Regions:
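Short, structured coil segments at secondary-structure junctions
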Residues: 68-69, 77, 159, 217-218, ...
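Conserved acidic, metal-coordinating active-site core of Asp-based
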Residues: 110-217
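Non-catalytic pre-domain segments flanking phosphatase-related domains
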Residues: 1-20
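Residue-level marker for buried hydrophobic side chains located in beta-strands
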Residues: 18-20, 73, 204
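Active-site phosphate-binding/coordination module
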Residues: 29-128
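Mg2+-dependent phosphoryl-transfer enzymes with acidic/Ser/Thr/Gly-rich catalytic loops
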Residues: 8, 13, 33, 180-261
Length: 261
């Protein structure tokens, strides 16, 4: 990972937009600090298209798409798009309703199995708003020991589901999307960007293991300082890293992009 200050001017000037994670990237321990929100508006006012890419549920995306200076949100780690449409929002699910219902039944069975194996594992407080996955709190409101997390991950695999892990949540899903495939589909279907060009025209900012697909897919990638805690889980680390963590690091990344443009 290179220092943020080494971002080349021509690379910054070639960007049309910025994709960004929420928890522990834009948000600081769940809070949207002022410098991070100001940075979003600075990027927007400079003409960059902004898209949030998060493991959070689509209900979060509906609020963000209405109130923030973004084109929309890629939620559920890629499965559901939420986009601004006039004065309202529209939701685009990658699955049809029958498939979604079937997968929800299997996820409910998985939740019961995990409850038997690791009774202290708690579902996240936003799980009722989720359509495509279930999530356990491993670091947001409680810290689940690593050995217990491993047991949950093993149970997810035995149920033929897929697990992903952020800095705060452990996700289980039967969907095949990840953040990169969901983001590229959003850029293509909602913004009209050709996927091959989008990976160089859009940058990504993240901090954790479930950001790995985007760190690998996009040319220009940034990590806030706390990404160093997740480097061992990343096959491809971000290209540039900020000196500060979370929202303050995001603000520094935004400022560097704008300074070089």
């Amino acid at each position: 990972m290179k220092p943020l200050a080494t971002l080349p001017t021509d690379e910054a000037r070639g960007l049309r937009g910025l994709l960004f994670d929420l928890d522990d990237t834009l948000l600081t321990h769940g809070l949207l600090v002022r410098v991070a929100y100001d940075a979003l508006w600075d990027l927007h006012d400079a003409g960059l298209k902004l898209v949030a890419v998060t493991g959070r549920p689509s209900g979060w995306g509906e609020v963000l798409a209405r109130q923030w200076p973004v084109e929309g949100c890629v939620t559920k780690n890629g499965a559901v798009h939420v986009l601004r449409q006039g004065t309202g929002v529209a939701r685009r699910d990658a699955c049809d309703e029958a498939t979604r219902r079937s997968r929800r039944v299997r996820l409910a069975q998985l939740v019961e199995r995990v409850r038997e194996l690791v009774p202290e594992a708690r579902l996240t407080d936003d799980v009722d708003a989720r359509r495509s996955d279930v999530t356990w709190d491993i670091g947001e409101r409680m810290k689940l020991p690593v050995d217990r997390v491993r047991i949950v991950v093993q149970a997810i695999g035995e149920a033929e589901a897929r697990s992903t892990q952020s800095s705060v949540h452990l996700h289980a899903t039967y969907d095949t999307d990840d953040k990169a495939s969901g983001a590229l589909r959003f850029l293509s279907q909602q913004l009209g960007e050709e996927a091959g060009a989008a990976v160089t025209r859009f940058a990504f900012v993240g901090d954790s293991g479930n950001d790995a697909p985007c760190f690998a897919a996009f040319r220009t990638t940034f990590g806030v300082a706390n990404v160093r805690d997740a480097v061992s889980r990343l096959s491809v680390p971000p290209r540039y890293v900020a000196d500060r963590a979370m929202g303050e690091g995001f603000a520094d990344i935004a400022a560097e992009i704008l300074r070089k443009r």
